[in-house]
Amino acid sequence: MNPEIFAKELAKYGFELNEKQKKQFATYYDKLVEFNKKVNLTRITDKNEVYLKHFFDSITPLLEFPDLFKGEKTLCDVGAGAGFPSLPIKILCPNLSITIVDSLGKRLKFLDELVNDLGLDKVTLVHSRAEDAGQNKDLREKFDLVTGRAVARMSVLSEYCLPLAKVGGYLVALKGPKAQDELAEAKHAIDVLGGKVEDVKELTLPDTDDDRTLIVVEKIKATPKKYPRQAGTPNKKPL
């Protein structure tokens, strides 16, 4: 998917990229490849692959559930790595306020430089484990949307993310193919943490056989204070 096809695909969903946005994605790609030589951010560096498997893939929640992103929403991206999915979404939705939580300082250095180079405002970077962020009173139950992509299986991801969503907010999980088994396994965790599965959308990336699953979980009640448990526990002993 070259930049021109990327723009055409987005236009099918009513998102017409302006010149500034096209330039932001081009800068994002250049910066990602340049920084990746020093810090391992991604194994995908081919331009067409980055536009498809990072940029377009990150934007799929916005394309499939546009109403979730309307207005002056707050979004927390847990374990964003090289900024996925939140920063591609931010380029298309400048009104979003983004908070990125990541535990690796080197990745945050990249993100800090990237946000500056892209000229993005309302982006906050937090150096923290997800479990600690969920117990931080400045972050807990503060966000309209919480995203997670390639972070952990659904039961673990729910414990990382749902404590950060406000009641009435949503967790949007970007998953690979056949996520239904993972979701069934996570049903208890989602319930305990105050969530309810609102929607599951299966899709295929354009002109590929790459299947993806988007899982939307609504936060319907407050998360019990004991969750998330201390760092490392959710992954070792999933709910």
From Swiss-Prot:
Q: A Pfam family this protein belongs to?
A: GidB
EC top class, as a word: transferase
InterPro entries attached here?
rRNA_ssu_MeTfrase_G (IPR003682), SAM-dependent_MTases_sf (IPR029063)
Residues annotated for S-adenosyl-L-methionine binding in this entry: 79, 84, 130-131, 149
Keyword entries, A-Z: Cytoplasm, Methyltransferase, rRNA processing, S-adenosyl-L-methionine, Transferase
Q: Name one GO cellular component term.
A: cytosol
Indicate yes or no for the key word Repressor.
no
Does the entry annotate any disulfide bonds, and if so which pairs?
none
What EC identifiers does the entry list?
2.1.1.-
Q: Where in the cell is it found?
A: Cytoplasm
Gene Ontology molecular functions: rRNA (guanine-N7-)-methyltransferase activity
Query: Record's HAMAP family?
Result: 16SrRNA_methyltr_G
Function comment:
Specifically methylates the N7 position of a guanine in 16S rRNA.
Instruction: Please give the family membership noted in the entry.
Output: Belongs to the methyltransferase superfamily. RNA methyltransferase RsmG family.
What protein name is recorded for this chain?
A: Ribosomal RNA small subunit methyltransferase G
Where does this protein come from, organism-wise?
Answer: Lactobacillus johnsonii (strain CNCM I-12250 / La1 / NCC 533)
Q: What is the lineage of its organism?
A: Bacteria, Bacillati, Bacillota, Bacilli, Lactobacillales
